[in-house]
């Protein structure tokens, strides 16, 4: 049985916790809680976490399903270099972002989720995992000569293979090539 790639779990957990943190921040700010400024901090922290976590990393084995329009954010995250690739840095960044939001009831759920994501990222870093971007593979165009052995000789619709006659069979049957064939039923041009 293969090893678990913890970074994939941490990525999903952190993205969800960023959304939860933003939602709690909106509730705290709109509800004018006593420490509403922590709500605005939570909105900003949630947006930062979501932007950092939106692009999925490539799995070491198998294929990875890319998120919609991920390629644009991948370029931004990739530009930060080792700051975004290293999971130790992500773990401590998420843990640091979650602490101030823990002092407000509306954002405590997002704080707990982000702390759990931080722990999973720390586990992924200890196991030696690293973020690598999903890069699109260049599309190979099939060679026309390589895929088609011999193009069809007669236009569609074509009769089934067993009904087709070989060119030599008509000559053996005594029917000259291109000559009209005789039908067993009489054909008339009258319209009834």
UniProtKB/Swiss-Prot annotation:
Cytoplasmic side: 2-7, 54-69, 81-86, 127-192
InterPro entries with a match to the protein in the record: Cyt_b558_asu (IPR007732)
Residues where Phosphothreonine is found: 147
Keyword set, alphabetical order: Cell membrane, Electron transport, Heme, Iron, Isopeptide bond, Membrane, Metal-binding, NADP, Oxidoreductase, Phosphoprotein, Transmembrane, Transmembrane helix, Transport, Ubl conjugation
Record field: transmembrane: 8-30, 36-53, 87-104, 106-126
Gene Ontology cellular component list: NADPH oxidase complex; plasma membrane
Residues covered by region (Disordered): 134-192
Major localization listed first in the record, in broad terms: membrane
Function: Subunit of NADPH oxidase complexes that is required for the NADPH oxidase activity that generates, in various cell types, superoxide from molecular oxygen utilizing NADPH as an electron donor. Subunit of the phagocyte NADPH oxidase complex that mediates the transfer of electrons from cytosolic NADPH to O2 to produce the superoxide anion (O2(-)). In the activated complex, electrons are first transferred from NADPH to flavin adenine dinucleotide (FAD) and subsequently transferred via two heme molecules to molecular oxygen, producing superoxide through an outer-sphere reaction.
Quaternary structure note: Component of the phagocyte NADPH oxidase core complex/cytochrome b558 complex, composed of CYBB (heavy chain (beta)) and CYBA (light chain (alpha)). Component of the phagocyte NADPH oxidase complex composed of an obligatory core heterodimer formed by the membrane proteins CYBA and CYBB and the cytosolic regulatory subunits NCF1/p47-phox, NCF2/p67-phox, NCF4/p40-phox and the small GTPase RAC1 or RAC2. Interacts with NCF1 (via SH3 domain). Interacts with SH3PXD2A. Interacts with DUOX1, DUOX2 and TPO. Interacts with NOX4; this interaction mediates superoxide generation.
Topology Extracellular: residue spans: 31-35, 105
PANTHER family per UniProt: CYTOCHROME B-245 LIGHT CHAIN
Protein name, entry field: Cytochrome b-245 light chain
Biological process according to GO: innate immune response; superoxide anion generation
Family: Belongs to the p22phox family.
Location in or out of the cell: Cell membrane
Family matches, as Pfam families: Cytochrom_B558a
Single GO molecular function: oxidoreductase activity
Intramembrane segment ranges: 70-80
Cross-link Glycyl lysine isopeptide (Lys-Gly) (interchain with G-Cter in ubiquitin): residue positions: 149
Post-translational modification: Phosphorylation at Thr-147 enhances NADPH oxidase activity by promoting NCF1/p47-phox binding.
Keyword S-adenosyl-L-methionine found: no
UniProt keyword annotation of Ubl conjugation present: yes
Membrane topology summary: Multi-pass membrane protein
């Amino acid at each position: 049985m293969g090893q678990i790639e913890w970074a994939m779990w941490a990525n999903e957990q952190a993205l969800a916790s960023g959304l939860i943190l933003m939602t709690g921040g909106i509730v705290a700010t709109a509800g004018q809680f006593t420490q509403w400024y922590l709500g605005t901090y939570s909105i900003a922290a949630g947006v930062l976490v979501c932007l950092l976590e939106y692009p999925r990393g490539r799995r070491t084995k198998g294929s990875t399903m890319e998120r919609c329009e991920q390629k644009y954010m991948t370029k931004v995250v990739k530009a930060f270099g080792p700051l975004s690739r290293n999971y130790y840095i992500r773990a401590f960044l998420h843990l640091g972002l979650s602490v101030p939001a823990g002092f407000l009831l509306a954002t405590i759920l997002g704080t707990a989720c982000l702390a759990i994501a931080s722990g999973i990222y720390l586990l992924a870093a200890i196991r030696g995992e690293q973020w690598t971007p999903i890069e699109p593979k260049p599309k190979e165009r099939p060679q026309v000569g390589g895929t088609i052995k011999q193009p069809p000789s007669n236009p569609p619709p074509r009769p089934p293979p067993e009904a087709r006659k070989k060119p030599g069979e008509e000559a053996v049957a005594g029917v000259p090539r291109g000559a009209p064939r005789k039908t067993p039923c009489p054909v008339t041009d009258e319209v009834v």
